[in-house]
Design a protein with these regions (language model features):
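Secretory-pathway glycoprotein ectodomains that are cysteine- and/or Ser/Thr/Pro-rich
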Residues: 4-188
Length: 188
């Protein structure tokens, strides 16, 4: 079998195509890092749901999150989007730290803002974290409100979450943070 037989028709090996592929793989790696971040020792209730407990949205439909916790803390909300981009929804330039009280049902965004399902269609995941301290992380500029990126940004969020949860030596304290997630789909 010659090397040309290994290439699938329609997939080029140009520098541009390889660059796009590398970008996609980096974004997917970043999303996986945050998507896999879990606390197996979590002993308190913490939940994130979508408006109407829906998980599938058509383009242009409203998306709203509801977060509940059995413990006081600060909420971090990260969207691992349908295009592989990691977007930090909370905290952001407008809401620098989002405090939740035990038993409270937090709605985000509030009534003054609407999130809509946007292209590309596909699957995504929203991961919510609760920590005793707010995240110490560079936020987006006021013009941008939300900060987004790929692998480097995901690593930055992960490190900020570890610091906010607290460390015992090099290990993250397991009793100081929690996480919840919801998988969603955007359809055409």
């Amino acid at each position: 079998m010659c090397s040309s037989d290994l290439r699938h028709e329609g997939i080029g090996a140009t520098d541009d195509a390889m660059g796009r592929l590398a970008e996609i793989l980096l974004k997917e790696s970043a999303a996986k890092t945050l998507g896999d971040m879990d606390n197996p020792a979590q002993t308190f209730g913490f939940d994130v749901q979508l408006l109407g407990e829906k998980t599938s949205f058509g383009l242009g439909e409203e998306i709203r999150f509801f977060i509940e916790s059995d413990r006081d803390g600060y909420v971090t909300l990260v969207d691992l989007g349908t295009d592989g981009t990691v977007a930090m929804l909370l905290p952001n330039a407008d809401d620098r730290s989002m405090r939740i009280r035990a038993g409270q049902r937090l709605e985000y965004p509030g009534e003054d803002l609407v999130f809509q399902a946007l292209e590309p269609a596909g699957g995504g995941l929203v991961r919510a974290f609760i920590t005793e301290e707010p995240l110490d992380i560079e936020l987006a500029s006021p013009q941008d409100v939300y900060r987004a990126g790929g692998a480097e940004f995901a690593a930055e969020i992960t490190e900020a979450l570890k610091r906010a949860a607290g460390l015992d030596g090099n290990a993250v304290r397991l009793n100081s943070w929690g996480t919840a997630s919801v998988v969603y789909e955007i359809t055409n």
